[in-house]
Amino acid sequence: MTNLTLDVNIIDFPSIPVAMLPHRCSPELLNYSVAKFIMWRKETGLSPVNQSQTFGVAWDDPATTAPEAFRFDICGSVSEPIPDNRYGVSNGELTGGRYAVARHVGELDDISHTVWGIIRHWLPASGEKMRKAPILFHYTNLAEGVTEQRLETDVYVPLA
């Protein structure tokens, strides 16, 4: 179940260096890319899930984008540059700036309700404008044993 009311805050988000794995195909295959990123994390220890932040960078809406054109980046914060590797994980940076942030609680399949709640309801009422940049998802409680219903994901909508 998703949030019934949104508690939205405006924050200044700092730029964050990340290890990034681009996903450039059908959203239905995203879990394969996520599994690849997890394998890279475990093998290298460079962005351990229990010490690093985990992000998704949503360039496109899967509901309105052709599967072959869909873009999503899987990211983990890092404290040093990462070397070339066989997984295709590279150095990247999450763009800083002003963002509207709301917490989504529950299954990731329902996260669009929170995204659209910010964009369609909160944004017009706030007088803020959306900046042309991707939406960020910060997965705040990824851990073994956390059920999908208890996942907490902060949704970051870029503001002008």
Swiss-Prot record:
GO terms for biological process: negative regulation of DNA-templated transcription. It holds the Pfam family GyrI-like. Keywords: Repressor, Transcription, Transcription regulation. Represses expression of mcbR. This is Probable transcriptional regulator YgiV. It comes from Escherichia coli (strain K12). The gene is ygiV.
